[in-house]
């Protein structure tokens, strides 16, 4: 029988970024849902700031306490159970493995990548089965998510704050802390990728580049590293992100892409995962065409609405928005290979390079694709493609 536990969850103010605000709510509600669906006996306690143990202990129900300090964390029932089993083996505290973490000891060896909640759960189950009851003692844990024995927490000073628990409990010298190798916890929905895949498509002839929707500047950071001589201008409507991007760009225009007023002739326009967020991407493509010199380039990436994970969810009557990914909450438009090809053609572009980014499907995904294609209802190339990477030339 799984012991009851209390989960302390951070109630933090999200930055003024729509996806992040959604992510904070999504991760909390999804973690609760996944634990409840598995029948776990969990008491949830929200906290603000960095409270002391004296403030939190009276609200704890059960002899196990899971302290979450990062609101962009998704818990799965297999992960919670694996951590509890680790504690049952005599450790005073236990942490999970993550998809992303600051701790090398807690980096998950994923058998396959996941792309949404359903595939995350599938991978979490695979890891829990593969690493059943495996744990390893470590010197320290990533504080994002740690399970403690209540009796150990009660030995700490009541003025000890939640952020101080990890080093303080280690200093008690009353037992070891460990990592539950079968406990996969998802962390993070931040999109700060440097997009090397798009940077690699920039031709040597491009000297003046416009980056639409530059976010916090990951693309510019990478591009300026390999091509420091390039003049790089970004467009970003979110002031928080724009301020971050200014470190890597020669200029950042703070406004919606629909309102940008530029007359310069650029050698290249970069549009990484932007079209799907716009109300009228077809008009924007024509506008971007007008900003390019004759023979100039448009490099873009766009998610594929025909990916197997989306198709499978639709067939099951599901359409679950997520903070980032194929079904990002801020997506307004959807493209397949034929529709993005048509949009570029009508906007005055000729496609020079067309790449299909394909994350290997999970075992259940492979079975779904195989069955759909065998029944004549699916195209394997489309079902296995999660994103299109395109370089087009202005005609």
List each language-model region with its residue ranges.
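Short, acidic, metal-binding catalytic loop of nucleotide-sugar glycosyltransferases
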Residues: 23-40
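Active-site nucleotide-sugar/metal-binding loop of Leloir-type enzymes
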Residues: 53-64
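Short beta-strand-to-loop acidic/aromatic patch adjacent to the donor-nucleotide binding site
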Residues: 62-73
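Conserved donor NDP-sugar-binding/catalytic core segment of glycosyltransferases
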Residues: 78-111, 304
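A recurrent flexible, glycine/aromatic-enriched loop bordering the glycosyltransferase active site
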Residues: 115-117, 122-148
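S-adenosyl-L-methionine-dependent methyltransferase catalytic module, highlighting the catalytic core
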Residues: 132, 136, 140-144, 154-157, ...
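A short, conserved alpha-helix in the catalytic core of glycosyltransferases
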Residues: 139-181
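Conserved N-terminal segment of class I S-adenosyl-L-methionine
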Residues: 183-264, 268-270, 282-285, 316, ...
